Amino acid sequence: QMCIRDRDKSLILDSPAYKKYCVDVKLKHNTWSHICGSDLIKAHDGKFYVLEDNLRVPSGVSYMLENRMIMKRVFPELFYQYGVTPIDAYPTKLYETLASVNNSRSKKPEIVLLTPGVFNSAYYEHSFLAQQMGIDLVEGRDLIVAKDGFVYKKTIEGLVKVDVIYRRIDDDYLDPDQGNPKTTIGVKGLIRAWQEKKVAIVNSPGCGIADDKAVYAYVPKMIRFYLKEEPIIRNIKTFLLTNKDHRNLVFNNFKEMVIKPVAESGGYGIVIGKNCSRSEKDATIRKVMNNPRNYVAQPLISLSTTPTYSGESLEPRHLD
């Protein structure tokens, strides 16, 4: 709200991730984002950069935990010699974070992890984290918003009231009443229950505004303006394609640029200039010109690599 008050509101109000139903909602601890998954890269200059921020549905932590477990088995001496900070407590810390937003008076809140289902690419992580925290893994069809406005999970013993939902479903698919009306993975009435504090949702609906890559471009300025500090880790230079000068620079140096949709994640919709044919370049420029707010551009970065076993040999693979 401070950012909107002090600067042009259009950056927020025109974002694909802006949700009007979040306006005036008051949350416990006044905290909207409880989990942040920023993508870090190591560039050719040897420095680390933040490539993008993920606050809507951050994913990937289970792979970090599994990787650390394997590394400790294979190279235990490295962890002993260099005092590497342990990460084993992550599931416990995550559970404590979820429990802290409980709006009920229960000392042992009922917490569930809401997954899109077995066909989601991150389903392994959903089941892993639910198991590690000792909470139920549920799909939308397992939950119901009753007449009293509270959320319940269906069990063989009957309905059990849910206090906190760790959602791994995008905003638009959480509730057919407030997003995609055809969603089959959400829960009808869930957003209203959240607005009325009858259930807590982590991360809160509306956090996608912080995922917006056009908003990302302003994060260093936000840090300097509001915290009076310099960012510890720098952002990648980002060109806003609503700006005519930025557009001209990007189009004139297309081969050195990466074009990204502001609301996508996981590499979806990205165009790498050097890999484009003439027709692909022209098609990308047309898309940008039709909706400049929907795209940003960044210079192509040479990412660090790690040896990866491909089935026959070790090959370099880029890291982020």
Where do the model's predicted regions map?
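A conserved short coil-to-beta-strand element within the FAD-binding core of flavoproteins
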Residues: 141-146
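Active-site nucleotide/adenylate-binding loops and adjacent lid/helix of ATP-dependent enzymes
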Residues: 13-18, 125, 130, 152-163, ...
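Short, small-residue-biased leader/transition segments that mark boundaries at the very start
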Residues: 2-4
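Conserved catalytic alpha/beta cores of large enzymes that bind or transform nucleotide phosphates
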Residues: 58-130, 194-198, 209, 213-215, ...
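Flexible, glycine-rich loop/tail regions that form catalytic "lids" or insertion modules at the edges
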Residues: 301-313, 317
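Conserved metal-phosphate-binding beta-hairpin within the catalytic cores
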Residues: 22-57, 320
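Extended active-site and interfacial segments that coordinate phosphate-rich ligands
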Residues: 47-85, 179-193, 275-287, 315-319
